[in-house]
């Protein structure tokens, strides 16, 4: 395949489109009305080391796990084919014979971060920024928190602000875009670490009651009212209860057995921590 794209990130990628006859073409940005599917073709990152292909292949399985747990994913999930991941795009649609393009803005942009390398961003700050732009902040906050809990459980440490975005849908609704770049980043030979953390987060020993207290304080300081605050800790406890069956779910979704065993202790620890969240 010739050409390149302006797709960000370190993984080699190509935008591609599929026509009505099933043929694939590079997407030069002017596919017009002949395109029926809009996809991203993603290849392993050589610098990720000997498990680069494992990371990419299990990204497809991780998406199945997220879908089963009720997180927002694309209607059709990524497919690992011939050493590459074919990912449905959520910013393009074919509707009534026309190509429709949707607006997308990264979390860094929403939060006003100009220099990510020189900025320490916390999840509380991200949520404050989201409150100013999404249509239903309460629902998006629950979605955002559950995504990060699953990041922790499954070892997706690559959580920088370009790996989460806001999507403007055709009806004008603004909400978190479907989950993307979600995989076992803990396997990466580059020793990727979590970039965005919670105020009060302590790796391995986090007291989520403290995290929630910090979040409530920050939202109050920002004059963001939450009508049903109790739903937040309830959501987290409920999600934690589901994590107890996560290893079995991972197996059913096709995650490698070795990855399941590597994540098992962290999953159990997080489930125990979330069960300790106080209820009022």
Q: How should each PLM-predicted stretch be described?
A:
Residues 1-161, 165-280:
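Anionic ligand-binding catalytic core segments
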